[in-house]
Amino acid sequence: MKNNKPLILAIDTSCDDTSASVMNGQIILSNVIASQTQLHKQYGGVFPTVAKQAHKENIAPTINAAIKKAKISWENIDALAVTIGPGLAPALEVGINAITELAKEKNIPLIAVNHIEGHALSAIAKRNSKEIEKDSISYPVLSVVVSGGHTQFIYFEEIGKYKILGTTIDDAAGECLDKIGRMLNLGYPAGPTIEKFAKLGDEKKFKFPLPMTSIKSFDMSFSGLKTFARNYIQSLTEDKPLSKQDIYDFCASAQYSVFRHINYKLNKLIIDKPINEIWLGGGVAQNIYLRQTIRETIKNFEKNNPTKKITFRYPHTNRLCMDNAAMIGLVANFKFERSEFITDFESLERKPRWKIGTNH
């Protein structure tokens, strides 16, 4: 049943997943994802031209499936939304072309969305109206986005006005873990395998450094951990290959070091800034151990500051951590309320390096 919020059809083709969703305000009516993971396995990573062709093949059936699953018709749709960046330029182009054609054909308003804003808000997507009734946001909010392409601390006192307080200056956390996994021949993508193996290992077995402790900023760096891992693996395998237990221990130690770095900076942030809620988003937000470590950081802060309480949220389903269109429709809902529509379709361009909170 439609509430008084807009019905928005959103699509996301930012990387290697084609997704379409129908959102009724913050409520997910459908969230269809056509994954390309199997296609890119042979390359050990996302191959842009392959991704573009797969998006072209998947976009129309994915949109149709989202509308069908939501049990609505085109006449019900109040607005269209699309990711225009950041992401792979050839992939973004497919989504932009598809949605602008639909906007012209159906004469429906169009909203452009930043992919990272989607991850930043994904924790407040809802299953039904009861969840909204029971919920209220207490600002300021710090969104922690951890993915294969981005690792950022995003601060805001209202949705739509963001400030990046910290970001990785090189590799993202997810990329670092994937590359360490590749060094251990764990396949692609390696992140989920590292999490699985880490449960069987000793996280203190191999001592990784803690980066950027002498830097006052909240920025992060993961390239040093990746280099350290490569050199460590080379030294360990000089005489004999790694045993299964060695691999488990190395996965546990690598994962621990990456999340320790994030939490070290997060702890500095919550001491320094007024923060009432922390929202976790991005592909690595699926990692249960990451959620546990953030909970622990919050718990320790509250123990030392008894009058302060921080609410911790993360997406209610792992599908919202992946690249998906529901989070794009969620952002579009708030932009709809602010009347932030695209008036000139011809001027709509992909923005592969678009930073949240900026126009470029």
Predicted regions and their residues:
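Glycine-rich beta-strand-to-loop/alpha-helix junction loops that act as flexible
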Residues: 82-86, 102, 147, 278-287
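A short helix-loop
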Residues: 2-8, 13-14, 21, 31, ...
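Glycine-rich phosphate-binding/hydrolytic loop that grips phosphoryl groups
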Residues: 119-122, 315-359
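Phosphate/pyrophosphate-binding loops at sites that engage ATP/ADP/AMP, CoA/4′-phosphopantetheine
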Residues: 62-78, 131, 237-240, 265-276
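Conserved phosphate-binding/catalytic loops in two-lobed NTP-binding clefts
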Residues: 112-113, 295-328, 342
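Glycine-rich phosphate-binding loops at beta-strand->alpha-helix junctions
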Residues: 92, 275-297, 317
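N-terminal beta-alpha supersecondary unit
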Residues: 5-76, 82-86, 115
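Conserved phosphate-binding catalytic cores of ATP/NTP-utilizing and phosphoryl-transfer enzymes
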Residues: 1-4, 113-141, 331
